[in-house]
Amino acid sequence: MAAATVVVPAEWIKNWEKSGRGEFLHLCRILSENKGHDSSTYRDFQQALYELSYHVIKGNLKHEQASNVLNDISEFREDMPSILADVFCILDIETNCLEEKSKRDYFTQLVLACLYLVSDTVLKERLDPETLESLGLIKQSQQFNQKSVKIKTKLFYKQQKFNLLREENEGYAKLIAELGQDLSGNITSDLILENIKSLIGCFNLDPNRVLDVILEVFECRPEHDDFFISLLESYMSMCEPQTLCHILGFKFKFYQEPNGETPSSLYRVAAVLLQFNLIDLDDLYVHLLPADNSIMDEHKREIVEAKQIVRKLTMVVLSSEKIDEREKEKEKEEEKVEKPPDNQKLGLLEALLKIGDWQHAQNIMDQMPPYYAASHKLIALAICKLIHITIEPLYRRVGVPKGAKGSPVNALQNKRAPKQAENFEDLRRDVFNMFCYLGPHLSHDPILFAKVVRIGKSFMKEFQSDGSKSEDKEKTEVILSCLLSITDQVLLPSLSLMDCNACMSEELWGMFKTFPYQHRYRLYGQWKNETYNSHPLLVKVKAQTIDRAKYIMKRLTKENVKPSGRQIGKLSHSNPTILFDYILSQIQKYDNLITPVVDSLKYLTSLNYDVLAYCIIEALANPEKERMKHDDTTISSWLQSLASFCGAVFRKYPIDLAGLLQYVANQLKAGKSFDLLILKEVVQKMAGIEITEEMTMEQLEAMTGGEQLKAEGGYFGQIRNTKKSSQRLKDALLDHDLALPLCLLMAQQRNGVIFQEGGEKHLKLVGKLYDQCHDTLVQFGGFLASNLSTEDYIKRVPSIDVLCNEFHTPHDAAFFLSRPMYAHHISSKYDELKKSEKGSKQQHKVHKYITSCEMVMAPVHEAVVSLHVSKVWDDISPQFYATFWSLTMYDLAVPHTSYEREVNKLKIQMKAIDDNQEMPPNKKKKEKERCTALQDKLLEEEKKQMEHVQRVLQRLKLEKDNWLLAKSTKNETITKFLQLCIFPRCIFSAIDAVYCARFVELVHQQKTPNFSTLLCYDRVFSDIIYTVASCTENEASRYGRFLCCMLETVTRWHSDRATYEKECGNYPGFLTILRATGFDGGNKADQLDYENFRHVVHKWHYKLTKASVHCLETGEYTHIRNILIVLTKILPWYPKVLNLGQALERRVHKICQEEKEKRPDLYALAMGYSGQLKSRKPYMIPENEFHNKDPPPRNAVASVQNGPGGGPSSSSIGSASKSDESSTEETDKSRERSQCSVKAVNKASSATPKGNSSNGNSGSNSKAVKENEKEKGKEKEKEKKEKTPATTPEARVLGKDGKEKPKEERPNKDEKARETKERTPKSDKEKEKFKKEEKAKDEKFKTAIPNVESKSTQEKEREKEPSRERDIAKDMKSKENVKGGEKTAVSGSLKSPVPRSDIAEPEREQKRRKIDTHPSPSHSSTVKDSLIELKESSAKLYINHTPPPLSKSKEREMDKKDLDKSRERSREREKKDEKDRKERKRDHSNNDREVPPDLTKRRKEENGTMGVSKHKSESPCESPYANEKDKEKNKSKSSGKEKSSDSFKSEKMDKISSGGKKESRHDKEKIEKKEKRDSSGGKEEKKQYPFHLNNALNQCMESFDADNVLKVYSSVV
């Protein structure tokens, strides 16, 4: 009772008589108005009486006063005596505790005074016996206590109710009979309850025992639930609520003995009582065993045991005894599982589930570990049954397959059971929740598994329909989320626990295939990586699966694919993720498993194939795996194996490709190109489109035909049966819109590989990644072009300007993607036009085709303008640019040979079929029909292509006049053509390489205005170093193919005069004088004749050799690899000249030796090429057979000119080309090595006659010109006599200080002899011979064959001069050439945009030139050739830009003075350098080999150059001087011509070599004055040309020297 506030104030007691008594009465009257016992007023009333009594005990108020007022108050309440007795009881206890006797006395007096108010009986109940004794109400308190004990014992401990059945068997028998009677009639629980009450009263039965008997009968009669529940509800209203729960708990405890087993009937009764809330679950739960902590411990123990099993299974077993031990352990574990202990909580749970009390069942499961309850089969089956009942109506409506009856499930009669689901929304109420508690143990009920999957499938169909409203869409999305959760937590784990149920797997795939692959793969990821770690059973299953997989994979071979495949299939039905993960790990280690594994996967289900795709992607994306090998230069073998496996498995089996393709796209977005290997393999295997650089020429030719020819002859492998697989790949790309994105990503990634990944990775790897990216783009684009319909392709590929400008696609890739679209467009337009007028003539068809081309290509011509700056279109027209990029080899030529080859193969095949006696007739007939059909297809395709090519050629014929504009020089036009068209496309693919070569030929054949074929070929061949160096491995292969095709054309023209005259003779592409635009090449004198063309071809071969040797000598990996690849590709047509081939052979041999241990891949390439080169050696020819060194008379006069200004001298074979080479060596030793290897290279040009270079028309040159040329010829002869030794002369390589490099291995004796010869003055006899030579020259000029010089004695004198003076002369001459031709650009190489002058040349270029001056065995002749070119070129400049020439005598005097001074300087410097030579000879004595004089002589004889001594051995040693002099005296006139020409050039070269940078200003000025005098006749000829090309030629000749080379060749000394 709460503490009451003070009710009676002390003032009332003090003034009791006056006012206090009245106030107290008034208070009590108010408090007595509420008669209840629970109100606060009742407590206040008690407090008021207590305080009044307490004042009496304290002595503040007399007891009489108090008794009087209490008497008055008694009238207010009837229960006044009881209240007052309670107050006295409290005061009795308080006063007993006090030691003050007075207070006790006052209390006794008060009670005595109030005895008339409270009865004695009430006081005896409330007060203490001792107090009662003091009041006199009892005699003795002791006797009272004894009597009270006796009464209580009689009342409470003496049995009055019968508890045991045997004590009152009649009563209990009647009770049982009452409860066990037939209850089907009108008997109600109320009637039975009245009878029970009567029996209890009559037979004194214990009510608790009666309740127990009722429960026992209820257990035995479960069918009368309603009756007994009603009876118990009525009965319990008379008992305490806890009684029923305690009785039930006592019953459960009875069965908790060690071997006790609780009956299911008891569980059921308890469950029913719980369902109807007659007992509380928490009250009953404490009576059940085992305890919760025991359950948790058991769960943990199961997990530990599962992990131990995993550990044991993964251990390496070496002996059979251990296997036996393992089997025994398995048996023991099975025995343990067979004897589960009695778990009353689970028994009650099962009962609750059976009656449908889901709420209480859920409460019990919540107190246990996850899935612990469901892990017991009975509980799992009970949950499954409840779910069966709940989903029955919905399943009947949407899940039952058509035609199936099914077995209906009866609903529970219990109204409190969960409501059944009528629609998908109802599933959210209870069903999904039930599945979550069931977990992986749905495996116990496959039927329910199938039902749920079918319901899910129906839901997905409804979800994917477009008719649903937005509100319904939100609800269905929630259901979808729940369905995915159920799939993750229940369906997939349950499948893992099922025993190889393929039907369930297929059923599940029926639902899974409606999910997008993102959902599927997320589910597979959860299944593989998390599910197996969450349940002890699944942990064991995972270990067992891996163990079994190991067993199968160890025994898998090609021979036992079928039985092993069946085992793999069986294992995969339940646990595909674990199995495939292990199989893929094995494939990554052992690539020889790929084929047997692929073959063994044919027994998988559809779901398993999809899981396999996911596992492959996960394996590819494994972040722990390195994608590169340890050397960081090659892609890891595991990735290559996976890629190969991907291609094979996706082709063979119907697996969804969307995920894999999206993965590759995502990797490309992230800038990672490694995984393109996957796409490459998939496209190759599925579509049969093979990308390889190892294609034969036959295959390449077949690839230029139609689709049928490509399939038959264009690939290495068998490309049949790809129709279905390529269709699947196409569908996957189109359905997920990945076709164009993948193309664009690959095109962009090509540059990304270089600029984003290039710095981090090894150059070799970057090249491989670039090639892989490019090849995959080509392959993928080819697949789209051949498989997509016209509509699909056009719909997806944007226009060319959008591709390039918006998507930043490189131009070559953009045109590659757009090309099929143009072809489709043109073809469809053409078909439309044909249909409009049927039966028209061929001419009309061509016209229609051209019309359709114009309609399609006109927008393209406009679009391409934005791709380049406007300046570009001054050189080439957009139409030409678009035409080049839009055509293919299919459009240009028909591969008749390929068609014929494939048709012949089919005929042979048909014959073999006829001859095969073992083949059944039906099969024979089928095969023959197939071959015949294929043959007809090929012939029809060939015919179709022929018609198409004819139409295309007609179109090109009409367009060609508008292709190239006359706004700029030919050189600029060719530059843009090569830069924007040829070079980007020739390295795009092997077919494009062939296309580029054939297109150049076609443009030539079409006689395209303003196109110089000669210039184009020269630019291609002149300097390939930079192009080769910048290529990747595959690009080098394609570039090699391009060069091979170009060389093939050139070789065809070179090999036969008739062919040359027919295909080039009258063509504007071979003009040597570039006239106005309208010129048609009709003037024969302006054409390059056959012999001079052969000289040009030799020059190109020399250029190729020089570039090749340079690349081989750099030591750079990419240079060496690429040039070897290029050389291998062009081997059929190069080298053709013996000495060039020998030079290459020596250099390649050296590479083989150097790289054997260092770089094995280069060694293999070099060895391969070396072997092939040796096999080609018998087909090589000497230089004099390759081109005629004696030029024809007519063309000796014919001039070659590049405009009114005349071109400067071309030194493309001599010094200018050398200044172009970047062959800088780091040490003197490396320079000497370069000498040995490149000697043969310069020999190529040594025997090449040089053409005269005049500025007049065909044969009518001015007299001044002739005289000038005559003077030059004499000078050459003199200088050659003085400076060329009788044996093979050598131009020394300049060192860094500008001095000559000494001959390393030349004996001292030779050097001394040489010095004495240099000091020998001219004899009288030699002077006489010189005069004779002048007369002979005059006669020759009169007969219109200028520049043919005779042998003279002065030549012998000049031969004695050292080669150093030739270098000086060449250096001075080249400088004069620059000064004399300032108004025109000095000719240079293809690659360099700057003028190639010796004066303006940077130090680096000078070093290059110095190294190149002495690299060849035939260097002397090379130097001569270069100087002749320089001399003649400068002569042309003189004709155009200088006053009339001086007299011949003055000119000769000037030459003599210059040469005398040069000789004096050379003698002085030679003394200084002699010491250096001797020292260097020792350092480099091992680098050069000596060649005996006999061998030197033999080589000279083979090349027809004995008189000139052009072939120089590798050794610096010269042949005996005397022998060579004698031979020279007996030489023929033609030999003399060559020799004088070469000696002059050699002399000039020696002057450059010896003089170097230290040449005095005085010498320079003198020679410059001489050059100005020589060029006196040039300006007179300017008038002859109607158009001005001076400025244009300046630009042109900065980067090109071909025309000048032609001029040099056409005028042979």
Curated annotation (Swiss-Prot):
Residue list for modification Phosphoserine: S1222, S1389, S1392, S1416, S1449, S1485, S1515
Main location: nucleus
Disulfide bonds: none
GO terms under cellular component: cytoplasm; nuclear speck; nucleus; THO complex part of transcription export complex
Any coiled-coil regions, as ranges: 293-339, 896-965, 1464-1491
Motif extent (Nuclear localization signal): 923-928
Keyword annotations from UniProtKB, A to Z: Coiled coil, Cytoplasm, mRNA processing, mRNA splicing, mRNA transport, Nucleus, Phosphoprotein, RNA-binding, Transport
Compositionally biased tracts (Basic and acidic residues): 1218-1234, 1264-1284, 1293-1342, 1352-1382, 1448-1503, 1523-1584
One Gene Ontology term of the molecular function aspect: mRNA binding
Function per UniProt: Component of the THO subcomplex of the TREX complex which is thought to couple mRNA transcription, processing and nuclear export, and which specifically associates with spliced mRNA and not with unspliced pre-mRNA. Required for efficient export of polyadenylated RNA and spliced mRNA. The THOC1-THOC2-THOC3 core complex alone is sufficient to bind export factor NXF1-NXT1 and promote ATPase activity of DDX39B; in the complex THOC2 is the only component that directly interacts with DDX39B.
Assembly description: Component of the THO subcomplex, which is composed of THOC1, THOC2, THOC3, THOC5, THOC6 and THOC7. The THO subcomplex interacts with DDX39B to form the THO-DDX39B complex which multimerizes into a 28-subunit tetrameric assembly. Component of the transcription/export (TREX) complex at least composed of ALYREF/THOC4, DDX39B, SARNP/CIP29, CHTOP and the THO subcomplex; in the complex interacts with THOC1, THOC3, THOC5, THOC7 and DDX39B. TREX seems to have a dynamic structure involving ATP-dependent remodeling. Interacts with POLDIP3 and ZC3H11A.
Protein name: THO complex subunit 2
Gene source species: Dasypus novemcinctus (Nine-banded armadillo)
Gene that encodes it: THOC2
